Structures are given as structure tokens and as C-alpha cells.
């Protein structure tokens, strides 16, 4: 493995290998994982779990992303957003990228097994395989519902963080997964509308390509309504308090606004603006969960 990586060191820089891990995507995942850890306990999270647990989850997420670069290199070469990625551009060979992914996954699993618990480690591995193999290798090319079905893998981080602390499953982290699961379709379908021509050229059956933009916009609006309702459940089951409820209502109302604007096609660049807002939405929603958790502890 080290030989493969060294063989391409003349062409690739550390930035290329960092790019393989999709660091911005992984950062958002780690924020939700971190929130899951803190929500799991009324006491402090042990620093070893906090540090090495999140590092292990992040390394495994980076490994899945690196595999995605290899499997999607033909698609990436067609799309303007991705044609300069390291594997597609030839700066990192597919073999080197896979070796790098194996290295990250091994290190990540090792950290999780050493510093958290077996359930957290195996759930993380299942999430890695779900994204890298089931979604990237099969679903993405097989069905316009690829994002809906494959969204479970991407929704796992708060569950992984929670289980890393507690060592067992419960309803609360599954609700956090459900929030991200409901958020995923409007998030990705908005981008798919913006990049519809490129997905069509790459022969990827994204919903706007197979069913048209109007159909997709209707479903973005419907999923946003579902997501809005789901985000109120933490308050309904007394998992969170008034601060979170107010934030969820305000953030959700803004998301619904963008989904409606996109549906009505009433503003230019509505699709990409909906996509961009959705990223901030998820980040701020989970920060609100965290802030509310500690506010309740101090009351």
C-alpha cells in the first residue's frame, strides 16, 4: 500500500489527498456526530471518545469519499464541478486512491475499536460500505431514488456519535438520523436541478433527468414539508426545549420559503440558492440542538 502511494507522490500533493476525503462534506458530518455525542449524556463526554471517536468517524467518512472519487471518475470527467478532481485529472491514480482509502478506513476502525465500542465501530463500517459500495457503486446509476435510499448512509453520523458515547441504540439518535434522512432529498435534488444537463450527459438517473424539473420541484417541496414536521419531533418528545423549537421553526420556515420559490420558479438561481441554504440549515439546526441541550442542563 505504501509503495502504491509513493509511486504517485511526484504528481500528487497532500492537498490532492485531502481533496479525496471531501473535507467540507466530512466537516458537516463531524458537526452532526459531535452534536450526537453531546446530546447522548448529561455529563461530559470523555475526551478520548470526543477526540478519537470523531477522528475515527471522520477517517472512515474520508475513506468512503476517496472510493467515491475512484468509482465516479468517468462521471466526474464530464461534469464541470468535478472534472478537476485528483483521480479524474490524473494527479492520483485509482490504485493510489483505493490504497489511501484502505489506510484511512483501517486507521478509523482501529481508533473506534480502541477508544469507543464495537457497536460504534461496526455501525461506522456499515455506513462506509453503504455509501462507498451500495450508493456509489450501484444506486447512483440504478434509480432516480438513489438519493432517498442512499441517504441513510449519509444520515448516520449523529447516531454514530451517540453510540460512541453510550454503546447502545435508542430512539433519540434514530430521530436525528431521520432529520438528516428527510433533509437529504431536497438538498441534493436542488443541486441536481442546477446541474441537470451535466447529470444527463453523464447518464446518471437523477430525478430532474428522469422525471423533469416540475416533478422534482414538487417533491422537493413535499420532502421539505416532511422534514419541517420531523424537526419538530425532538421538542414533541421532550428531547429538546423552547430554544430549539424556535430555531427549528424559523430555519424550517426559511427552507420552506426557498422550496416554494424554487417550485414557483420566481427567482433566478433558485435551485443553487436552495442547495446553499440547505447546508447552512442543517449546520444551524444541529447547533440549535446542542445549545438547547446545555441550556436545559443549566435550568
Curated annotation (Swiss-Prot):
Q: Which GO terms describe its molecular function?
A: protoheme IX farnesyltransferase activity
Q: Where in the cell is it found?
A: Cell inner membrane
GO biological process terms held by the UniProt record:
heme O biosynthetic process
Its placement in the membrane is given as: Multi-pass membrane protein
Q: Which family does it belong to?
A: Belongs to the UbiA prenyltransferase family. Protoheme IX farnesyltransferase subfamily.
Could you list this entry's UniProt keywords, alphabetically sorted. Answer: Cell inner membrane, Cell membrane, Heme biosynthesis, Membrane, Transferase, Transmembrane, Transmembrane helix
Name the job this protein performs: Converts heme B (protoheme IX) to heme O by substitution of the vinyl group on carbon 2 of heme B porphyrin ring with a hydroxyethyl farnesyl side group.
Enumerate the Pfam families for this protein: UbiA
Q: Which InterPro entries match?
A: Protohaem_IX_farnesylTrfase, UbiA_prenyltransferase, UbiA_prenylTrfase_CS, UbiA_sf
For this entry, the protein name equals Protoheme IX farnesyltransferase
A cellular component term from Gene Ontology for this protein is: plasma membrane
Coiled-coil region list: none
Instruction: Name the reaction it catalyses.
Output: heme b + (2E,6E)-farnesyl diphosphate + H2O = Fe(II)-heme o + diphosphate
> Which superkingdom?
Bacteria
Amino acid at each position: 500500500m505504501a509503495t502504491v502511494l509513493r509511486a504517485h507522490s511526484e504528481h500528487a500533493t497532500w492537498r490532492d489527498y485531502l481533496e479525496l476525503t471531501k473535507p467540507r462534506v466530512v466537516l458537516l458530518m463531524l458537526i452532526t456526530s459531535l452534536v450526537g455525542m453531546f446530546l447522548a449524556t448529561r455529563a461530559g463526554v470523555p475526551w478520548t471518545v470526543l477526540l478519537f471517536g470523531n477522528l475515527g468517524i471522520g477517517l472512515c467518512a474520508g475513506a468512503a469519499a476517496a472510493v467515491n472519487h475512484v468509482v465516479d471518475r468517468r462521471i466526474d470527467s464530464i461534469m464541470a464541478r468535478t472534472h478537476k478532481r485528483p483521480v479524474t485529472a490524473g494527479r492520483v491514480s485509482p490504485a493510489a486512491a483505493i490504497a489511501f482509502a484502505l489506510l484511512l478506513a483501517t486507521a478509523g476502525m482501529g481508533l473506534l475499536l480502541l477508544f469507543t465500542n464495537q457497536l460504534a465501530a461496526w455501525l461506522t463500517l456499515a455506513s462506509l460500505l453503504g455509501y462507498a459500495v451500495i450508493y456509489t457503486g450501484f444506486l447512483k446509476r440504478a434509480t432516480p431514488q438513489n438519493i432517498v435510499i442512499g441517504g441513510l448512509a449519509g444520515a448516520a453520523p449523529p447516531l454514530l456519535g451517540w453510540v460512541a458515547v453510550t454503546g447502545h441504540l435508542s430512539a433519540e439518535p434514530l430521530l436525528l438520523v431521520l432529520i438528516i434522512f428527510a433533509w437529504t432529498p431536497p438538498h441534493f435534488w436542488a443541486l441536481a436541478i442546477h446541474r441537470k444537463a451535466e447529470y444527463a450527459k453523464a447518464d446518471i438517473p437523477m430525478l430532474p433527468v428522469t422525471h423533469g424539473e416540475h416533478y422534482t420541484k414538487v417533491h422537493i417541496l413535499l420532502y421539505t414539508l416532511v422534514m419541517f414536521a420531523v424537526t419538530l419531533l425532538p421538542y414533541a418528545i421532550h428531547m429538546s426545549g423552547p430554544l430549539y423549537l424556535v430555531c427549528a421553526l424559523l430555519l424550517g420556515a426559511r427552507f420552506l420559503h426557498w422550496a416554494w420559490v424554487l417550485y414557483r420558479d420566481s427567482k433566478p438561481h433558485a435551485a443553487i440558492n436552495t442547495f446553499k441554504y440547505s447546508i447552512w440549515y442543517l449546520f444551524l439546526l444541529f447547533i440549535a440542538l446542542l445549545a438547547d441541550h446545555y441550556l436545559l442542563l443549566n435550568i
